[in-house]
Amino acid sequence: MSLNRLHIEAFRNITSAQLQPGDGLNVIYGQNGSGKTSILEAIYFLGMGRSFRSHLSQRVINNDADALTLFANMQSAEDESKIGLRRFRSGEIEVKINGDKVKRLSTLAETLPIQVITPESFSLLFEGPKSRRQFIDWGAFHSDPRFYAAWVNVRRILKQRNQLLRDESPYSSIQFWDKEFIRYAELVTEIRKQYVDSLNELLKGIIEEFLPQVDVKVSFTRGWDSKTEYAQLLETQYPRDLATGFTVSGPHKADLRLRVGTLPAQDALSRGQLKLLVCALRIAQGKLLKQQIDKKSIYLVDDLPSELDAQHRKLLLQQLADTGAQVFVTAIEPAAIVDSLITPPSKMFHVEHGRVTVIE
């Protein structure tokens, strides 16, 4: 999967821009505030229906516009398709794929799988289990068609269950929901575990490339005691759940644990090593996606020179090239990227005050 045409309108400081990206590495350079990161953000928005920089989507709409518009042609090995999105300041969003209206944003994610490596993405190891669950669930969503519906049902029933707990309902009332909840929770957990097991097989070799002197162990924890049946746990834990007003254990507490020896990776590794570990995780995900469903991710890498030294920039760019994926990389100066490449980039773009120019 790659974008061979991208149209951006009223997105942050980009009034209007047309790009024809290359299949491989696309270098986007310009000064801070020029709009180069906004191009990455626009691609992400097109694939996810939201920004990776702000939780308030209205903020990405140009101040002089009532809506933003994004459009792309996508090329795969089999065919070409078109995807379009309009986001209004009112909050309304319109999405079309090949001219047909799309109601679920999950369809965007399925159509356009995107991996992001930004200064903020390194929070994967620091911001607690939620970001690591999201990492697992991205892969589980793409690898198993059963996952999304099961995950939606877990969230729906968990919300109802927690409300019953806050209302101090008897367990007999909660038990009615638990039968369905347990079924979906166990399916979500099974798919997550299978995904992490498959990821681990690829990840070991990639980590050895990035961190050859470090033995990183990656494991999945399901969110409750592995020796206890979930149905039994929910029943015995009812008094505790009632006291807290929410379900203490379950798939909503799952985590991806990364350890070096007896220590969590974030305590054992330097900041530079942690950046490399996150890069390894993202690359492994992209490679596994290709292996499982024969679909390539699109990689968005923001401000690479400030995050990695020259040696590790070269290693990351080579690993990205090995995935065969389309890659968009930003930098202030193009030499910081080009000098780390074995072969020239597919395309280069210069951004200044929101205007995009292709460099021949």
Curated annotation (Swiss-Prot):
It is found in: Cytoplasm. The keyword ATP-binding applies. SUPFAM superfamilies: P-loop containing nucleoside triphosphate hydrolases. Disulfide bonds: none annotated. Transmembrane segments: none annotated. PROSITE patterns: RECF_1 (PS00617), RECF_2 (PS00618). It comes from the Bacteria. Pfam families: SMC_N (PF02463). One of its GO terms (cellular component) is cytoplasm. GO terms for biological process: DNA replication; DNA synthesis involved in DNA repair; double-strand break repair; SOS response. NCBIfam families: recf. The RecF protein is involved in DNA metabolism; it is required for DNA replication and normal SOS inducibility. RecF binds preferentially to single-stranded, linear DNA. It also seems to bind ATP. Belongs to the RecF family. This is DNA replication and repair protein RecF. It comes from Shewanella piezotolerans (strain WP3 / JCM 13877). The gene is recF.
